[in-house]
């Protein structure tokens, strides 16, 4: 036990004590330090307490000050709270009242809806009742018609029996028959006038019937018998005349017996006809010509036309134009029908009308000698009274229906009645025997059952002679023109004619007075006729008289619309030479019109279709056909059209459409000559397939086909109908199917280099070979699709969708790849759009060879280290041995291999194909793309750590590799440079004097992205990265990054998933309280607008960048603005954004200025030329305003490299381009004013014919509008000389602005002084007159020129030409193309638009191919030397006119069906050119549309 205790005894306690004392000292030192620190801390806290107490004291003092202020203002907290509480209660009570009002209004709205529903049901019931009543009434009339025919037949038998008895009593004729003969003869004469059923005027009597009326009774009864037998044999569709026979008698016997006696007297004296004409004056003369005579005639005649008599034959179209009809075919609305003097029917009518007076005189003289003079009998009065009462009973129930609607009354007349050809080149000159028709009241009881059962908007099937002349009534109705003065009546007979107003549209529109009844059949009235007229006729309205000053202007204008012969012709010839040699720079034109030089258009289906964007060359459509014989003569129009009817057994046998069965002559009838009505053409399922090879359920594609196509010839650009046969890899064509055993007229070799391009029209295709380009047109889109499919099969194309156009949308990636499938390889151009991979033959091809749907497909890279290169070798193509392979394996399909030549391209394709397939694979693409894919998988969770990754945040250093996958190393290098450019833009401070630095940086960066679309994703990702870190307000970097991002998204948008990332980024940063957030909101608006209107084409302009950087664009919905100039010198500032199109821009402009839409007003937006020349360019509606401004700036800098004018920008002008006379009624005051100044611009530049006197009158009118009253210089003591100088200066300005240049050039000082004096006299005569009156008179005078509103182009015909070698004006107007003399501006010839076959560029000239009426030369090609920019302008202008009328016709056609409600006879269906044939019984009909 001692051993363990020994160590305890060995402890050195002293040392341990020393150690413990040392530790104690350390503790003491530490304690002292702690005390010191604690003391310091306490002192610091004490100081803080003192400061806090001082601040609290100060705050307490401030509180006291504030309380004192509040007390001083008598504002206490309790009172303010009470007041706020009361205000809150008041607001709540008001809100409750508003809610109650809203609920009451909602209840009332529901009640109104229920009331409207009930009213609609009532109206439908009434409509059904009316429909039933009309059906019953028609049935009754039909039964009555049958009864009348039976009665007529019975009376005919009785008449024959009486005739036999009369022959037996021939010897006792004088003693037994003389007394009743007078009464019976008078009775027959009373009704005999109405037996004629000629389509000539109803008052013209057949010579045979006149002789029968004046002869004995057997002859009369025999004539009636024969006529009734002829009527009984007419088809059912013409029974309306039989039905209205008795009613016509009832209606027309309203004339008194005095008028009947007077009729006989007039027949005895004048032969029943008007002087010097076979047509009566009363029915066919205008109100102006008749004067008081036309208004004094009774209401006897209300029918519009009647059947043609046997002697008259089928007369010309002499029916009324009150209710014009239009077919549903594709003839345009502007195709006005005119007389054709070569028609035998019209010659027959003319000769018959010339012979009628002499026959009538002879027969009447003979009848008068036999029947005697005393023919007044009491039975005549009784019959007249009886039938008059019956007529009133019949017509009382349909008085409203008999009243024509003023909306339906205007007649359709050509704007240029004496100039436009009917079928091409022949002038529109009506025959001398044609009288002007008058509007007449239709007869409601003349509607036949067949006409009512048929839908009124359907076109009728026509006979061979009158094919295509049917018209739909409402679709051809034009609104009335505004009331203007007719200057043609100034020199009329009598004092009253001087001041008469013309209420029609123009000189060709027949006036109609709703108070004037149609003239009676008794057309030969003398001066005593008004005394014997019916008393119920209203008095003649008073004639309008003009003031003396207005009459003086109209008198000058009557003969003033012509060019004075005294002006300098040498100057005009010099200007013409300058115009021909004047050409604009093509840079800006190509930018505006998308590289369109001088396009070529053709007219198909009434619509102008572009078939080429470049001018035709000599070999543009060459063939061996041009050298073949042209001995085949062209069939006549009637023969050609007769084959197209459905009754043709040949057409039915072949099973082709109407147009396919048309003429097989050398020159085909244009496709717009055939109807497009669905019931006229045959159904598609009945069409006989012309393919010779069976499709075998789609497995074996056909390689042979035959059928009719239209081919454009080479020398004369017109369409020729040929029979094409595709066989053995060649396309042969013949004149007809019967010529296939002969040598073909030409052949087209189909090889691998051939390409098939579809034109703008659905029926036109362009077949381009190595040598020539062929333009082919099929009869229908379905037939064309069959041809394209077979042609592509022949070209060894495996088309998954051969007729699919190039897909819309921006491709994510595109390039030339090798596609391998099923062991076959092919070099194709691939394009990834959305989730579909399209592949084409080449980059320019518009038709994809096939497509590959990638959604849920398996996309991966293939390791081909074990494969041999021979497996992937392609025919004719050399591939590197180091190419890469991507396999695309869609669901339920075999795999497709894509061979790619470079690694960068492979990575780009692999990433985009993987994204398109919707794969969740995040191992493809760059690091940035993988992070975006991860964010997409978690739907952008805000709390995710991925957002904090450095790759997604702002960085001050540059990047070493692109953020996105790019297909080439050069693009990767460019992406790194692009990031540096963005850094320079963001980091450099914006300084207004040095703003051009930022402008150049932004334009260069965005221009690179527009040039290389692959970089668009890259720059968007870079800007998202650089704007993700929010900085303090005094650091401008990120703010300028937002500005650059705003410029970027206004131009283009990235693809998915970067677009999703951009939208999420903008959404997270949108905040209206900060400037960054405001720019984020502005970027959101830009993204929406870009998605709506598509990407831009040009980089941002200087104005756009300045507005974005300096003018806070987030404060405005339209951050940019530009002035639009008008022809009167004023301008309107219009706002727009980065994606605003011209169409949207014009809608805003029209809304601000109070003008109509461009489709109605014809106004368009023009820009000046950046070269500074006096040229203008019309802007199309789909171009963006910012692109126009940018392209204009680029062109200006390139054309004027030495000048750098930052303030010079594009000048926009808004003026009239298309003038429609039918739209003049709705012109606003602003439009009239602008038309006034635009007409003045034509006048001062010599594009409007008027002599010096009229030019001075017009200048005075315009001075009154522009300046106001002329201030006469008074001699005052202050300064008489000063006033005189001021007046002379004003007159000088007026002469320079409003007087033609050619009349004032070369004038001496004395002549100018006299001109100033004459102008001042005329100007002072207008003192006190308003601007509206002066504008009205100015436009009234200007519209008297037939080519008002037309655009004139200087041209020189190229020899050989039928127009000679002199310079001419080409006037493009609403009805066609007219050629005017250069000096006098007189009309040379005109061509309607339906006669224009082809027009556009031909080498360096302007070409027009027109159809003529010559059999030897059915078409004519006219060439004109013009400036290049003028060729483009006139081509686009003609196409715009044609397409505008086509669109109007389509609109009117759709609106026509419900509007055809007014009852009519068959007579309104007859037009001026000829009567329509009866409705075919085989035509399918619909139920009547009565309401």
UniProtKB/Swiss-Prot annotation:
This is Pleckstrin homology domain-containing family H member 2. InterPro entries: Band_41_domain, FERM/acyl-CoA-bd_prot_sf, FERM_2, FERM_central, FERM_domain, MyTH4_dom, MyTH4_dom_sf, PH-like_dom_sf. Expressed in the kidney and testis. Expressed in the kidney exclusively by glomerular podocytes. It is a peripheral membrane protein. Residues 954-1109 form the MyTH4 domain. Residues 657-666 have a biased composition (Low complexity). Keywords: Cell membrane, Cell projection, Coiled coil, Cytoplasm, Cytoskeleton, Membrane, Repeat. Residues 19-177 form a coiled coil. It comes from the Eukaryota. Self-associates. Interacts with TGFB1I1. The keyword Repeat applies. In the kidney glomerulus may play a role in linking podocyte foot processes to the glomerular basement membrane. May be involved in stabilization of F-actin by attenuating its depolymerization. Can recruit TGFB1I1 from focal adhesions to podocyte lamellipodia. Residues 253-264, 392-406 have a biased composition (Polar residues). It is found in: Cytoplasm; Cytoplasm, Cytoskeleton; Cell membrane; Cell projection, Lamellipodium. GO terms for cellular component: cortical actin cytoskeleton; cytoplasm; cytosol; lamellipodium; nuclear body; plasma membrane. Gene3D superfamilies: 1.20.80.10, MyTH4 domain, Phosphatidylinositol 3-kinase Catalytic Subunit, Chain A, domain 1, Pleckstrin-homology domain (PH domain)/Phosphotyrosine-binding domain (PTB). Residues 232-435, 506-546, 612-668, 1466-1491 are annotated as: Disordered. Residues 1120-1449 form the FERM domain.
């Amino acid at each position: 036990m001692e051993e363990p205790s020994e160590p305890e005894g060995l402890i050195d306690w002293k040392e341990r004590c020393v150690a413990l004392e040392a530790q104690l000292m350390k503790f003491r030192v530490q304690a002292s330090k702690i005390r010191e620190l604690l003391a310091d801390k306490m002192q610091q806290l004490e100081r803080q307490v003192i400061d806090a107490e001082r601040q609290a004291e100060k705050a307490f003092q401030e509180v006291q000050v504030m309380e004192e202020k509040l007390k001083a203002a008598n504002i206490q907290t309790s009172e303010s709270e009470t007041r706020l509480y009361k205000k809150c209660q008041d607001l709540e009570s008001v809100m409750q009242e508003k809610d109650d009002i809203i609920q009451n209004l909602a209840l009332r709205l529901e009640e109104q809806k229920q009331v409207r529903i009930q009213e609609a049901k009532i109206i439908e019931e009434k409509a059904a009742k009316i429909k039933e009543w009309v059906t019953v009434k028609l049935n009754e009339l039909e039964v009555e018609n049958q009864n009348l025919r039976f009665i007529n037949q019975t009376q005919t038998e009785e008449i024959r029996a009486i005739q036999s008895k009369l022959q037996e009593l021939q010897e006792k004729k004088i003693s037994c028959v003389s007394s009743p003969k007078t009464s019976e003869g008078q009775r027959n004469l009373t009704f005999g006038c109405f037996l004629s059923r000629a389509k000539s005027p109803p008052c013209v009597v057949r010579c045979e019937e006149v002789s029968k009326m004046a002869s004995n009774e057997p002859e009369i009864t025999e004539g009636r018998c024969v006529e009734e037998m002829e009527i009984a044999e007419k088809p059912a569709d013409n029974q309306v005349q039989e039905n209205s026979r008795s009613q016509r008698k009832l209606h027309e016997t309203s004339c008194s017996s005095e008028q009947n006696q007077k009729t006989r007297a007039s027949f005895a004296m004048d032969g029943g006809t008007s002087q010097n004409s076979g047509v009566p004056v009363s029915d066919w003369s205008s109100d102006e010509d008749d004067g008081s005579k036309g208004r004094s005639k009774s209401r006897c005649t209300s029918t519009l036309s009647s059947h043609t008599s046997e002697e008259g034959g089928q007369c010309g179209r002499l029916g009324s134009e009150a209710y014009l009809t239009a077919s549903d075919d594709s003839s345009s609305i502007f195709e006005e029908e005119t007389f054709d003097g070569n028609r035998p029917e019209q010659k027959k009518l003319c000769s018959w009308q010339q012979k009628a007076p002499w026959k009538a005189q002879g027969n009447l003289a003979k009848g008068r000698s036999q029947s005697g003079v005393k023919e007044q009998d009491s039975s005549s009065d009784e019959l007249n009274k009886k039938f008059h009462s019956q007529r009133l009973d019949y017509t009382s129930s349909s008085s409203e229906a008999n009243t024509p609607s003023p909306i339906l009354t205007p007649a359709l007349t050509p704007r240029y009645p004496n100039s436009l050809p009917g079928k091409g080149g022949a002038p529109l000159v009506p025959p001398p025997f044609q009288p002007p028709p008058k509007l007449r009241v239709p007869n409601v009881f003349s509607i036949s059952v067949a006409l009512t059962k048929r839908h009124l908007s359907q076109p009728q099937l026509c006979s061979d002679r009158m094919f295509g002349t049917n018209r739909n009534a409402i679709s051809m109705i034009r609104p009335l023109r505004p009331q203007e003065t007719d200057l043609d009546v100034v020199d009329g007979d009598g004092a009253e004619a001087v001041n008469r107003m013309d209420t029609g549209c123009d000189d060709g529109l027949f006036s109609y007075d709703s108070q004037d009844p149609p003239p009676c059949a008794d057309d030969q009235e003398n001066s005593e006729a008004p005394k014997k007229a019916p008393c119920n006729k209203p008095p003649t309205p008073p004639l309008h008289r003009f003031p003396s000053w207005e009459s003086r202007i109209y008198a000058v204008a009557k003969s003033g619309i012509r060019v004075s012969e005294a002006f300098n012709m040498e100057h005009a010839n010099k200007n013409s030479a300058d115009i021909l040699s004047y050409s604009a720079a093509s840079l800006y034109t190509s930018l505006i019109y998308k590289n369109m030089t001088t396009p070529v258009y053709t007219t198909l289906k009434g619509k102008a279709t572009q078939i080429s964007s470049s001018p035709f060359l000599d070999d543009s459509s060459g063939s061996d056909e041009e050298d073949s014989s042209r001995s085949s003569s062209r069939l006549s129009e009637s023969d050609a059209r007769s084959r197209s009817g459905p009754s043709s057994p040949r057409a039915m046998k072949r099973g082709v459409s109407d147009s396919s069965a048309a003429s097989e002559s050398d020159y085909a009838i244009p496709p717009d000559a055939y109807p497009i009505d669905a019931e006229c053409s045959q159904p598609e399922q009945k069409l006989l397939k012309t393919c010779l090879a069976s499709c075998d359920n789609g497995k074996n594609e056909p390689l042979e086909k035959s059928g009719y196509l239209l081919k454009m010839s080479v020398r004369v650009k017109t369409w020729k109908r040929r029979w094409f046969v595709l066989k053995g890899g060649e396309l042969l064509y013949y004149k007809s199917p019967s010529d296939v055993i002969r040598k073909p007229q030409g052949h087209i070799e189909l090889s691998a280099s051939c390409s098939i391009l579809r034109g703008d029209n659905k029926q036109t295709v362009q077949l381009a070979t190595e040598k020539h380009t062929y333009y082919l047109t099929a009869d229908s889109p379905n037939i064309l699709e069959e041809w394209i499919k077979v042609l592509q099969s022949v070209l060894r194309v495996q088309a998954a969708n051969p007729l699919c156009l190039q897909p819309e949308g921006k491709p994510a990636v595109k390039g030339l790849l090798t596609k391998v499938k099923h062991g076959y390889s092919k070099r194709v151009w691939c394009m990834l759009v959305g989730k579909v991979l399209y592949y084409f033959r080449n980059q320019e091809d518009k038709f994809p060879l096939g497509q590959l749907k990638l959604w849920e497909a398996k996309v991966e890279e293939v390791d081909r280290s074990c494969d041999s290169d021979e497996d992937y070798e392609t025919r004719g193509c050399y591939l590197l041995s180091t190419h890469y392979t991507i396999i695309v394996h869609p669901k339920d399909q075999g795999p497709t291999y894509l061979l790619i030549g470079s690694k960068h391209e492979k990575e780009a394709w692999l990433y985009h194909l993987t994204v398109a397939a919707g794969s969740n694979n995040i191992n493809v693409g760059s690091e940035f793309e993988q992070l975006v894919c991860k964010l997409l998988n978690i739907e952008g969770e805000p709390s995710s750590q991925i957002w904090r990754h450095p790759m997604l945040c702002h960085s001050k250093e540059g990047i070493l590799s692109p953020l996105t996958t790019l297909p080439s190393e050069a693009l990767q290098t460019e992406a790194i440079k692009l990031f540096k450019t963005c850094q320079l833009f963001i980091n450099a401070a914006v300084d207004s004097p040095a703003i051009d630095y930022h402008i150049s940086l932004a334009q260069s960066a965005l221009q690179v992205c527009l040039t290389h679309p692959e970089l668009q994703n890259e720059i968007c990702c870079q800007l998202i990265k650089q704007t993700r870190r929010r900085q303090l307000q005094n650091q401008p970097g990120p703010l300028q990054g937002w500005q650059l991002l705003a410029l970027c998204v206004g131009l283009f948008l990235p693809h998915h998933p970067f677009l999703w990332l951009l939208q999420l980024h903008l959404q997270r940063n949108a905040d209206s309280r900060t400037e960054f957030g405001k720019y984020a909101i502005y970027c959101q608006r830009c993204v929406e607008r870009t998605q709506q209107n598509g990407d831009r084409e040009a980089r941002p302009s200087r104005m756009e960048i300045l507005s974005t950087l300096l003018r806070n664009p987030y404060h405005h919905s339209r951050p940019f603005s530009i002035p639009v100039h008008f022809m009167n010198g004023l301008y309107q500032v219009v706002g727009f954004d980065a994606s605003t199109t011209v169409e949207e821009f014009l809608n805003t402009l029209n809304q601000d200025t109070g003008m109509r839409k461009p489709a109605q007003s014809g106004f368009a937006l023009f820009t000046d030329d950046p070269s500074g020349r006096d040229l203008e360019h019309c802007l199309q509606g789909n171009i963006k305003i910012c692109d126009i401004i940018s392209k204009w700036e680029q062109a200006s800098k390139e054309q004027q490299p030495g000048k750098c004018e930052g303030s010079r920008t594009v000048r926009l002008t808004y003026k009239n381009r298309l003038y429609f006379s039918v739209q003049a009624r709705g012109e606003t005051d602003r439009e009239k004013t602008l038309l006034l100044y635009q007409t003045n611009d034509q006048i001062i530049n010599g594009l409007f014919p008027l002599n010096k006197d009229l030019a001075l009158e017009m200048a005075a009118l315009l001075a009154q509008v522009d300046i106001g009253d002329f201030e006469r210089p008074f001699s005052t003591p202050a300064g008489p000389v000063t006033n005189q100088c001021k007046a002379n200066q004003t007159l000088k300005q007026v002469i320079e602005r409003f007087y033609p240049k050619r009349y004032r050039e070369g004038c001496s000082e004395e002549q100018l002084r006299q001109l100033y004096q004459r102008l001042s006299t005329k100007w002072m005569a207008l003192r006190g007159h308003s601007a509206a009156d002066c504008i009205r008179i100015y436009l009234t005078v200007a519209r008297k020129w037939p080519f008002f509103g037309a655009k004139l182009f200087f041209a020189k015909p190229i020899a050989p030409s039928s127009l000679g070698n002199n310079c001419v004006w080409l006037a493009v107007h609403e009805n066609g193309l007219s050629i005017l003399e250069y000096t006098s501006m007189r009309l040379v010839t005109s061509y309607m638009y339906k006669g224009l076959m082809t027009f556009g560029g031909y080498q360096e000239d302007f070409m027009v191919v027109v159809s003529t009426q010559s059999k030897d030369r059915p078409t004519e090609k006219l060439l004109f030397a013009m400036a290049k920019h003028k060729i483009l302008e006139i081509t686009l202008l003609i196409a715009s006119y044609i397409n505008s009328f086509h669109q109007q016709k389509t609109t009117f056609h759709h609106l026509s069906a419900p509007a055809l409600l007014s009852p009519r006879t068959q007579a309104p269906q007859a037009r001026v050119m000829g009567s329509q044939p009866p409705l075919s019984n085989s035509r399918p009909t619909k139920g009547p549309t009565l309401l």
